[in-house]
């Protein structure tokens, strides 16, 4: 298994994985549109020994109170059903966080199960007076600081790219 930055030839495999992993094709369309419009900050794939995409995570820019603070949102994260339970999601997330830290990004936000994401260092964004536009997500919206001062004096609405409006 190999984890690496996605390349153009991976797009069909990523699309197929996302369509298999989620109830609708919304996530596949989201990644396609972010990629096509140049708003995919980082996409990482996990491939098997034959080069087939078996895992994927995407990161795209977010604004806080309308400002670009070098924050990104992590979504979607998917692992092929046959490879779940082997730590592949953890490896994808950690590789992404490490790369983003090296690139100088300040923080990462995500929507998901706190029991899962807290293991990666995410904490509830509401504890820092941060929220996203979707009502009822307070218990799922989380933040991970990459820079020590990323959360200093930062509060308010975290806005994802308009392509996320489909959700």
Curated annotation (Swiss-Prot):
Q: What does this protein do?
A: Upon overexpression suppresses small RNA (sRNA)-mediated RhyB-silencing of multiple RNA targets; overexpression leads to partial loss of RhyB sRNA and other sRNAs. May act via Hfq.
Please report which protein family the annotation says this sequence is part of. Belongs to the acetyltransferase family.
CDD domains on file: NAT_SF
Q: Which Pfam families match?
A: Acetyltransf_1 (PF00583)
Top EC group = transferase
**MF terms in GO:** acyltransferase activity, transferring groups other than amino-acyl groups
Mutant lacking the gene: phenotype:
No visible phenotype.
**The protein, known as:** Uncharacterized N-acetyltransferase YhbS
Annotated keywords: Acyltransferase, Transferase
In this protein, which residues make up the domain named N-acetyltransferase? 1-148
Q: What InterPro entries does its record include?
A: Acyl_CoA_acyltransferase, GNAT_dom
Q: What Enzyme Commission number(s) apply to this enzyme?
A: 2.3.1.-
Give Gene Ontology CC terms: cytosol
């Amino acid at each position: 298994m190999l984890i690496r930055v996605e390349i153009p030839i991976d797009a069909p495999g990523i699309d197929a994985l996302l369509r298999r992993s989620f109830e609708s094709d919304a996530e596949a369309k989201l990644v396609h549109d972010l990629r096509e419009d140049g708003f995919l900050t980082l996409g990482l794939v996990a491939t098997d020994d034959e080069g087939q995409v078996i895992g994927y995570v995407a990161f795209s820019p977010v604004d806080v109170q309308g400002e670009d603070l070098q924050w990104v949102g992590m979504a979607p994260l998917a692992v092929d059903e046959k490879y779940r339970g082997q730590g592949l999601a953890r490896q994808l997330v950690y590789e992404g966080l490490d790369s983003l830290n090296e690139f100088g990004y300040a923080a990462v936000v995500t929507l998901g199960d706190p029991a899962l994401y807290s293991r990666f260092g995410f904490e509830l964004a509401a504890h820092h007076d941060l929220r996203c536009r979707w009502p009822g997500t307070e218990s799922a919206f989380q933040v991970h600081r990459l820079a020590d001062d990323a959360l200093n004096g930062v509060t308010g609405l975290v806005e994802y790219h308009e392509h996320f409006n489909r959700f």
